[in-house]
Amino acid sequence: MSEKPFVDAPPPEDGVAHQVSPHDNGSLSEEANSINEYTGFGAHQEGEIRELARTFTNMSHDSGHDLSKTNTSQDLLKYLSHMSEVPGVEPFDPEQISEQLNPDSPNFNAKFWVKNMRKLFDSNPDYYKPSKLGLAYRNLRAYGVAADSDYQPTVSNGLWKMAVDYWHDMRKIDESRCFDILKTMDGYFKPGEVTVVLGRPGSGCSTLLKTIACNTYGFHIGEESQISYDGMTPDEIHKHHRGDVVYSAETDVHFPHLSVGDTLEFAAKLRTPQNRGEVSRLEHAKHMASVTMATYGLSHTRNTPVGNDFVRGVSGGERKRVSIAEVSLSGANIQCWDNATRGLDAATALEFIRALKTSAAILDATPLIAIYQCSQDAYDLFDNVIVLYEGYQIFFGKASEAKQFFLDMGYECPQRQTTADFLTSLTNPEERVVKPGFENKVPRTAKEFSDYWRNSSNYKVLTAGIDKYLAEVADGSQREAYRASHVAKQSDHTRPSSPYTVSFFMQTRYIIGRNFLRMKGDPSIVIFSIFGQGVMGLILSSVFYNLQPTTGSFYYRGAAMFFAVLFNAFASLLEIMSLFEARPIVEKHKKYALYRPSADALASIISELPVKLCMSTCFNFSFYFMVHFRRDPGRFFFYWLFCGLCTLCMSHMFRSLGAVSTSLAAAMTPATSVLLAMVIFTGFVIPIPSMLGWCRWIQYINPVSYVFESLMVNEFHGRKFECAQFVPSGGPYDQVAAVNRVCSTAGARPGEDFVDGTAYLQTSFEYVNAHKWRNLGIVVAYIVVFLGVYIALTEFNKGAMQKGEIALFLRGSLKKVRKQREQNEAKVNDVENNLPNEKISYSDAMEKDSGESSTSDDKLPNQRQIFHWKDLTYQVKIKAENRVILNHVDGWVKPGQITALMGASGAGKTTLLNCLSERLTTGTVTDGVRMVNGHGLDSSFQRSIGYVQQQDIHLATSTVREALTFSAYLRQPSHVSKKEKDEYVDYVIDLLEMGAYSDALVGVAGEGLNVEQRKRLTIGVELVAKPKLLLFLDEPTSGLDSQTAWSICKLMRKLANHGQAILCTIHQPSAILLQEFDRLLFLQKGGKTVYFGDLGKNCQGLIDYFEKHGAHPCPPDANPAEWMLEVVGAAPGSKAAQDYFEVWRNSEEYQEVQRELAYMENELGKLPVDEDPESRKKYATSLIKQYFIVTWRTFQQYWRSPGYIYSKFFLVITASLFNGFAFFHSGTSQQGLQNQMFSMFMFYMPLQTLIQQMLPYYVMQREIYEVREAPSRTFSWFAFIASQITTEIPFQVVLGTVAFFCWYYPVGLYQNATPTDTVHERGALMWLLVTAFYVYTISLGQMVVAFMEIADNAANMVNLMFIMCLNFCGVLATPEALPGFWIFMYRCNPFTYLIQAMLSTGLANTKIVCSSREILHFQPPSGQTCGQYMQQFISAAGGYLLDESATDQCDFCAMSQTNTFLDSVHAVYSERWRNFGIFIAFIAINMIGTIFFYWLARVPKSSKSKNH
């Protein structure tokens, strides 16, 4: 049971629960406070304890008292030490333990459970070996390289930038290109203490946490830095104890279709220790997962999918708690939490920090947490605080001493400002307040703050503590004890030096189980794949149905076997896409030391085996027997064995390509090149005798060629095939002697009426029976080699390095940005060096705002309409149950008022916003009305509102200004001039203080704009639209620091003062922030209203309501939001004294709300409705204007995505050149003609990959459109589809032109036009056909994905359609050979007309010259020359004799003109232009289909039953 029970964060286990650390400088009372102040959720004593703690905190803040010297502190310790006796038992059997230890019981007590585990560990320390881990660093410095010269590459400069970057990488790092992220700093952390890291975004908080967690990939640590983890170096920690020092990122990355319970149980299994007592691994893991879910309020979500921004699942706050629980289960001693409270409501955030405190105090964990918004109650829980300012450390010490340190420095803390906000505000020159008389004494710049700190007595205490710590760990005893504890946790067969808890094979087993659960959560891909293989087996086999055992089936038998091999080989190509979907999660779990990436690689292969078996069975059974291959059990199972091995081999190879690549586009391009090489050199397209010498080696290293050879031998060896066609034959030739004719098939001998299959293989392919089983060993060897390569690459490939949250600009704007930056720095220095005598504090900021007037403020819209709703009820169907999400919610939003929408995570806040704004996509609004001024909502409602979503969803390649301009141009009325829109965009940029990065690209999460900048942009996008009715904001302050959150609230107040109606959800409002709201709508679980009314001054209206209805009094210095959450039972672990939903429904306040709503409905409805047709339009701008603006943005996105465009060109150039030179100057023999025909077939191979490359970009843009732009009526779906179609066409035309030159001339098709002097005309037509093919490629992909939700399924559908097009185009099987049922496919197939046009244009009107292998030999009748004997046959069937006068042996070539060959495949030269026109029509059909299918599948249809 060495695993740290996780309530909260994986606590380090150490010796005695209440023991004071030997190197602790201070205070038994502080340690006691750590243990006691937070012992028990919801107990009666909780209030008394909190009051005592708050009293002590105030004493400390006011007078700097050392609590260890007060009797009161000792009394508190004594009081808490007499709490309920803890049993110290194993809590895994629910029938043998108390309800307080049972996580499935409503009476479960998380802190009691932790204490029980501590006592259990202490009862047998030699067995459990509890561990703890401290940390110290000295002269710590972190730096990055060359950010200032970095810029966003485009198609025009991407290659140059790539070359420059490569040159820099090859050289030693130039110090002039380095910039410091963290300046030199010192610190140390003792087990049992919780440390908070404070600083504004960009100050280095995340970098510090990453450095401590040894997660430094992407930046560098200075050589002078000294870091010690109880005597261990960062390198030792990373190699041997990675999972004991973890970093929890701000973003939440999980498998969206996996349930919460399965996600957490999986993490628990992989950290289940060996020394866990008598309980089984499974029971232990289930119990630990249940404990974390109960602790973090997730028990009710056990069977709910985690979800993500695009897959429906738990709420955003619940998803954040899942991330917290996962880290907790990882069992780390040192936990680095990066803004872990983002998205949590205030009470849940407080409980999370309490849980960390419990884990630290009782289990000796060492948590560090960076928080941007920290309440006073939360701050009081921390032992230490670090304050960072632009990378400088300006304080490190006791949290209770930090405030006084800066007060003594000469700064002033405004009234009602929390300590955390005060400390953070000191790093902002425009926020901090200087005491009178200290104006010229206080430090101003970040460096001055740092110098002041380093010269202080506090710093000397810190350095003394570091020296003492390093001296204590110098003997290595703590290191050895820690390693012994680590080894005791490890399962059997795990290396002691491994950072993992369970063995490799156990990891693999658990991951296999998880993978099956993922398939169960989203079975569509698996079902679609299996179904698709079965359908394709039936379709392909029907093309070659029931081949007869004659020589006429030789070509078709070979073609059928070739397709069977290819279909089995490349069935796994799309696995590359799923690899990249899972990679971020695998990398995260590697950092947590849950499992090796190689274990995930092996497990993914094993878990796919049943799927592959089903796919192989569905395809091969029907295919083998319908084609009428050899009906022999041994032959069939040999065929099935090789097909299965071929699938495995190629799966491993494609996975290896994916593992070595850093992006999907980078993986798919080489995969297609490899695929093309394998197809061409399988042995069918170009038989071995016809392969050119320079590329013959490709066949030797091609595993597919060995499979094809063995299967052909399996089918042909030892069989005699009746001759289907003799030369000469027909008429009088049927009566000639056998010696005077020969079968017209390779391997035939004169005088025989059959052809031996072995001879045919030897003559045509150079295949021999002796290789049949030899090839089995070769293929198995390839499987093993590729498997090893894949596992090794997965284990050691570091993946893509993140650039970090560093703004990237376009190359052309770098000079402007640098100049602006210099001006800003000068301005900042001016502000810092000329501090005014009076600074604006929180308390008077709004007074100043309201007092000053600005002409620019007149730009803000002024509204006068009221939005109100009544009895709003919404439910969704989950399995067989209708779950109510919103329960009869009432309310209104009036112009000039800000209404706060609050509630616990999962209470339905975002759902209510979506319901009010008509953005619901699932479920049913079963009751209620929504009105504007007493009238129902019209078609213009959605564009009349602004909706700031919780997720910051933007196009990564747009700049900030472009994103704002795009919204303004499309959403402001069309009568507003472009100049006015541009001016308003500039105004909003100034209003939101985005000028410094207005020309920066948005980037993706983690790279580009930081969280704060993204949130400002999200708000700005809605503001520039000038919403005339209402502004919704969903968590606008989530993830922001307190100062930025305050500025957002000031902005909302400014908007409200100009008549804007605002409804805003908010999770963690401080007391000061909450006062800026006018009204509050509070929801509890189930979407039930608990309160809707005025807040009043200092929130007194809210407090009076709840106190009037039985709530315990709100302390004067408490945060009303947190107090309210506890009162109504919305905080984890708290219970409401009564049902406040019923209290509300029975209150006088509720009756007043009903009367007000009735008045609005009756009286406002009498007001005239705006009849202006402009205001009632669904979209603000015309469709043609939407089209041009959206098309320009889409083109811009592609231009700024050089990786996508370059991968297209690289794929097309390599494929075309390879194809051209593999069939180099094929000549005009029969085999040469067939080679040229197959070269055209191979020319089509990039189609699938080009579409697969396009799909992620299309889906990404579609998600942005459907999640954000469509609901806000920015532009219509038709403009979106039309822009996607239009943007791709120019790129495809250029691709087609490049492909034409790289392929047409090497193959030598132009030579076929020389005899008729039509080189230019036929070359021009071939160029048109080639470019049309590339345009068709993208049009097909867009049509398929238009109605598909998942890119993988769209790719599968494209593969299915592509294969069907190739099979039914009349070349592999002529119309005469096709079953009658499939003739319609031949007629409706675009490739029929494309291949006929290309064949006739490329091959027509030239002579055939047979090679020696193609010459047929037979004797003429006695007394006749060959010319006399064959004259009648040649005139009827064609062909020519080498020597017409020969009398002993006739040498005959069966064809003399290419037109004869073309006639056999119905490629008529005179129809070439007609066929081209028909193919163009198919492109148009695809485009129309794209529009139709998108409308059919994805455009919401109006519902007559919708009740407004």
UniProtKB/Swiss-Prot annotation:
<dbReference type="Pfam" id="PF14510">
    <property type="entry name" value="ABC_trans_N"/>
</dbReference>
<feature type="transmembrane region" description="Helical">
    <location>
        <begin position="634"/>
        <end position="654"/>
    </location>
</feature>
<keyword id="KW-1133">Transmembrane helix</keyword>
<dbReference type="GO" id="GO:0140359">
    <property type="term" value="F:ABC-type transporter activity"/>
</dbReference>
<feature type="topological domain" description="Extracellular">
    <location>
        <begin position="1310"/>
        <end position="1326"/>
    </location>
</feature>
<dbReference type="GO" id="GO:0016887">
    <property type="term" value="F:ATP hydrolysis activity"/>
</dbReference>
<dbReference type="InterPro" id="IPR003439">
    <property type="entry name" value="ABC_transporter-like_ATP-bd"/>
</dbReference>
<feature type="transmembrane region" description="Helical">
    <location>
        <begin position="1240"/>
        <end position="1260"/>
    </location>
</feature>
<feature type="domain" description="ABC transporter 2">
    <location>
        <begin position="867"/>
        <end position="1110"/>
    </location>
</feature>
<feature type="domain" description="ABC transporter 1">
    <location>
        <begin position="165"/>
        <end position="415"/>
    </location>
</feature>
<feature type="binding site">
    <location>
        <begin position="903"/>
        <end position="910"/>
    </location>
    <ligand>
        <name>ATP</name>
    </ligand>
</feature>
<feature type="topological domain" description="Cytoplasmic">
    <location>
        <begin position="1348"/>
        <end position="1362"/>
    </location>
</feature>
<feature type="topological domain" description="Cytoplasmic">
    <location>
        <begin position="655"/>
        <end position="673"/>
    </location>
</feature>
<feature type="transmembrane region" description="Helical">
    <location>
        <begin position="776"/>
        <end position="796"/>
    </location>
</feature>
<dbReference type="Pfam" id="PF06422">
    <property type="entry name" value="PDR_CDR"/>
</dbReference>
<feature type="transmembrane region" description="Helical">
    <location>
        <begin position="609"/>
        <end position="629"/>
    </location>
</feature>
<feature type="topological domain" description="Extracellular">
    <location>
        <begin position="630"/>
        <end position="633"/>
    </location>
</feature>
<dbReference type="InterPro" id="IPR003593">
    <property type="entry name" value="AAA+_ATPase"/>
</dbReference>
<dbReference type="InterPro" id="IPR017871">
    <property type="entry name" value="ABC_transporter-like_CS"/>
</dbReference>
<feature type="topological domain" description="Cytoplasmic">
    <location>
        <begin position="581"/>
        <end position="608"/>
    </location>
</feature>
<feature type="topological domain" description="Cytoplasmic">
    <location>
        <begin position="1261"/>
        <end position="1288"/>
    </location>
</feature>
<feature type="transmembrane region" description="Helical">
    <location>
        <begin position="1363"/>
        <end position="1383"/>
    </location>
</feature>
<dbReference type="GO" id="GO:0005886">
    <property type="term" value="C:plasma membrane"/>
</dbReference>
<feature type="transmembrane region" description="Helical">
    <location>
        <begin position="525"/>
        <end position="545"/>
    </location>
</feature>
<feature type="compositionally biased region" description="Basic and acidic residues">
    <location>
        <begin position="845"/>
        <end position="860"/>
    </location>
</feature>
<dbReference type="Pfam" id="PF01061">
    <property type="entry name" value="ABC2_membrane"/>
</dbReference>
<keyword id="KW-0472">Membrane</keyword>
<dbReference type="InterPro" id="IPR005285">
    <property type="entry name" value="Drug-R_PDR/CDR"/>
</dbReference>
<dbReference type="InterPro" id="IPR027417">
    <property type="entry name" value="P-loop_NTPase"/>
</dbReference>
<feature type="transmembrane region" description="Helical">
    <location>
        <begin position="1204"/>
        <end position="1224"/>
    </location>
</feature>
<feature type="topological domain" description="Cytoplasmic">
    <location>
        <begin position="1"/>
        <end position="524"/>
    </location>
</feature>
<dbReference type="InterPro" id="IPR010929">
    <property type="entry name" value="PDR_CDR_ABC"/>
</dbReference>
<feature type="transmembrane region" description="Helical">
    <location>
        <begin position="1327"/>
        <end position="1347"/>
    </location>
</feature>
<keyword id="KW-0812">Transmembrane</keyword>
<dbReference type="InterPro" id="IPR034003">
    <property type="entry name" value="ABCG_PDR_2"/>
</dbReference>
<feature type="region of interest" description="Disordered">
    <location>
        <begin position="1"/>
        <end position="30"/>
    </location>
</feature>
<dbReference type="InterPro" id="IPR013525">
    <property type="entry name" value="ABC2_TM"/>
</dbReference>
<dbReference type="InterPro" id="IPR029481">
    <property type="entry name" value="ABC_trans_N"/>
</dbReference>
<keyword id="KW-1003">Cell membrane</keyword>
<feature type="topological domain" description="Extracellular">
    <location>
        <begin position="1384"/>
        <end position="1475"/>
    </location>
</feature>
<feature type="topological domain" description="Extracellular">
    <location>
        <begin position="695"/>
        <end position="775"/>
    </location>
</feature>
<feature type="topological domain" description="Extracellular">
    <location>
        <begin position="1225"/>
        <end position="1239"/>
    </location>
</feature>
